[in-house]
């Protein structure tokens, strides 16, 4: 498998000379297995450049097929979809894979971005074939030669980590998550107050989910001095990512 980062920033895209090395686009990753299964993880502004590259391949001929894994639907993770060129080419096929939520679907959320007050092209007018598949948290799925595991993260709303296994390798993608001992966030996670027993169970579970993966991709929105008094904002530090990678025995860490 090959994993490419097209966007690594959070909250909003940036364009500054001191950020050129890692780029300024918001979250988007692309994974392709040796067998040709293609997975897009989130549609921040980085998905725009990914789309341009895809149009140079079979997607430009209307022959492309990809899965789109939805980590969560905060705006910095979906704002690029209206500008994703392969959506506008008839014959292309995409399946949004997302956790089921009560009262709202991923189609509702994406269509909202295309409301004529925000964007001139209605979502239903996109030329590509777009399907949807919902899963329950903890469910494991198989798409082509890729096996996907799912885990709920500690972030406002419903946020999902994915474990992708293919070609004898594995990677875990944790985009947005917070220190569980400092706050409890997200649908069904309970109140915001820390709880030692819950934190211990969560830590054990997320470690097991990541255990033995060749690569862990993990949120590191803050550095240590920045996170003080901001633990409730749903993000971690590079040190937090390193500690999880050490507990889980991951071979490589990207943050």
Describe the predicted segments one by one.
Residues 1-186:
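Binuclear metal-dependent hydrolase catalytic cores
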Residues 28-33, 133-255:
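Metal-dependent phosphodiesterase/nuclease catalytic metal-binding core
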């Amino acid at each position: 498998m090959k994993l490419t980062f097209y966007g690594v920033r959070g909250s909003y895209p940036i364009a500054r000379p001191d950020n050129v090395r890692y780029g300024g686009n918001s979250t988007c990753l692309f994974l392709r297995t040796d067998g040709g299964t293609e997975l897009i993880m989130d549609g921040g502004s980085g998905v725009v450049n990914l789309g341009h590259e895809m149009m140079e391949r079979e997607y430009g001929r209307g022959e492309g097929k990809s899965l789109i894994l939805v980590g969560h639907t905060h705006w910095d993770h979906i704002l690029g979809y209206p500008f994703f060129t392969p959506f506008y080419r008839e014959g292309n096929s995409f399946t949004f894979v997302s956790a089921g939520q009560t009262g709202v679907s991923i189609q509702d959320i994406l269509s909202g971005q295309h409301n004529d007050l925000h964007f001139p092209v209605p979502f239903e007018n996109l030329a590509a074939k777009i399907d949807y598949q919902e899963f329950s948290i903890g469910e494991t799925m198989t798409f082509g030669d890729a096996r996907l595991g799912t885990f709920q993260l500690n972030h406002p709303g419903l946020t999902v980590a994915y474990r992708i296994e293919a070609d004898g390798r594995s990677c875990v993608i944790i985009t947005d998550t917070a220190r569980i001992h400092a706050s409890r966030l997200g649908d069904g996670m309970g109140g915001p107050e820390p709880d030692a027993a819950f934190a211990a169970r969560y830590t054990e579970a997320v470690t097991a989910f990541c255990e033995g993966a060749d690569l862990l991709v993990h949120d590191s929105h803050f550095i240590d001095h920045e996170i003080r008094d901001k633990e409730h904002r749903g993000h971690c530090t590079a040190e937090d990512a390193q500690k999880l990678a050490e507990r889980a025995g991951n071979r490589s860490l990207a943050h």
